[in-house]
Each structure stands twice: as structure tokens, then as C-alpha cells.
């Protein structure tokens, strides 16, 4: 392989590593979209009709599989409009870089009435976040840095 061919191969590899690659598993799947040029997340769509019961939860399919860029993971986050207008939030939202199964969305309905999702509705957003892959090192209590906060948690730093 010539130097030029190797350079082109390296460029293509880098481009693939920086792309959100999406496989549409069926004709019911919709490619994720961004609401605006500066949107942090990609809207993801339901591939099926579903009803999330009042005060309940449900698992909604998207019929997509993704390959996130190296050094990132995908976080499934709520859509603000669904949260404010309908009391819908998301859960269990980590997509690891090596996961290749269908992306499914856990939805919680905090409202007092059932919420119906139609095929093609935007149900969540996928946000790519950088990660640090740190080695784990077991330490002793003496090696644990002392901080001003100490063991305070669960509201210990303020009144509200």
C-alpha cells in the first residue's frame, strides 16, 4: 500500500470514528434527525404504536441500531416538549460503543392519563457524550483525598 493509499484509508477510518452510524432495521425505522443546526441531541422516533399507561412505564421500539463514535457513548434523554406538555420522561438511557442491538426507549408517564405514541413520533433524543476510560485502582481510606465537603450528600451543600 502506498503512502497516499494509507493516508486515504486513515482519513476514512477517522471519518467513520467521528460519525454516528445508523442501521435501519426495518421499513418502520426513521433515521434520527436534529431539530436545528446547534441541537445537542438527535431526535429518535417510535417504530410502532404504543400506549404508556397513566403513572406507568413502557418500552418503545425504534427499529434502529447505532454505532457511536469511539470515545463516546449515546445517552437517551427526554424531549423537553414531551416532559412539559405530557409528563413523559426517559430512563435506562446508556448506549455503549459496542452495543449493536435495537435502540429501545424506556418511557415513564407521570401524568394521570394514558399517553398514546404513534409510529413515527419523536419519543426521545440521543446525545453523544465523551467518556474517560479510567483504570480502577483500589486505595485505602487514608489515600482518599480529604475535601471540604467530606461525606455530605443529598442536599448537604444548601437549603434547596
From Swiss-Prot:
Cofactor(s) recorded for this entry are:
Mg(2+)
Q: Pfam families recorded for this chain? A: dUTPase
Lineage here is: Eukaryota, Fungi, Dikarya, Ascomycota, Saccharomycotina
Query: What is the recorded function of this protein according to its Swiss-Prot or TrEMBL entry?
Result: Involved in nucleotide metabolism via production of dUMP, the immediate precursor of thymidine nucleotides, and decreases the intracellular concentration of dUTP so that uracil cannot be incorporated into DNA.
* EC identifiers of the protein: 3.6.1.23
Key words, A-Z: Hydrolase, Magnesium, Metal-binding, Nucleotide metabolism
Binding-site positions, dUMP:
80, 93, 96, 99, 104, 149, 154-155
* Organism annotation: Debaryomyces hansenii (strain ATCC 36239 / CBS 767 / BCRC 21394 / JCM 1990 / NBRC 0083 / IGC 2968) (Yeast)
Q: What class of enzyme is it?
A: hydrolase
Q: Which reaction does it catalyse?
A: dUTP + H2O = dUMP + diphosphate + H(+)
Family under the similarity heading: Belongs to the dUTPase family.
Q: Which GO terms describe its molecular function?
A: dITP diphosphatase activity; dUTP diphosphatase activity; magnesium ion binding
Biological process (GO) annotations held by this record are: dITP catabolic process; dUMP biosynthetic process; dUTP catabolic process
The domain of life for this entry's organism is Eukaryota
Named in its record, the pathway it takes part in is: Pyrimidine metabolism; dUMP biosynthesis; dUMP from dCTP (dUTP route): step 2/2
Q: What is this protein called?
A: Deoxyuridine 5'-triphosphate nucleotidohydrolase
Subunit structure, as described in the record? Homotrimer.
- The gene designation is DUT1
Amino acid at each position: 500500500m502506498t503512502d497516499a493509499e494509507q493516508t486515504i484509508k486513515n482519513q476514512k477510518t477517522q471519518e467513520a470514528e467521528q460519525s454516528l452510524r445508523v442501521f435501519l432495521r426495518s421499513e418502520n425505522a426513521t433515521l434520527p434527525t436534529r431539530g436545528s443546526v446547534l441541537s445537542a441531541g438527535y431526535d429518535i422516533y417510535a417504530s410502532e404504536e404504543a400506549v404508556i399507561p397513566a403513572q406507568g412505564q413502557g418500552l418503545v421500539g425504534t427499529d434502529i441500531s447505532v454505532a457511536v463514535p469511539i470515545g463516546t457513548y449515546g445517552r437517551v434523554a427526554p424531549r423537553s416538549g414531551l416532559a412539559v406538555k405530557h409528563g413523559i420522561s426517559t430512563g435506562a438511557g446508556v448506549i455503549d460503543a459496542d452495543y449493536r442491538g435495537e435502540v429501545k426507549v424506556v418511557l415513564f408517564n407521570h401524568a394521570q392519563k394514558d399517553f398514546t405514541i404513534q409510529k413515527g413520533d419523536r419519543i426521545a433524543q440521543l446525545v453523544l457524550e465523551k467518556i474517560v476510560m479510567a483504570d480502577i485502582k483500589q486505595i485505602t481510606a487514608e489515600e482518599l483525598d480529604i475535601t471540604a465537603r467530606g461525606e455530605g450528600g443529598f442536599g448537604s451543600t444548601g437549603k434547596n
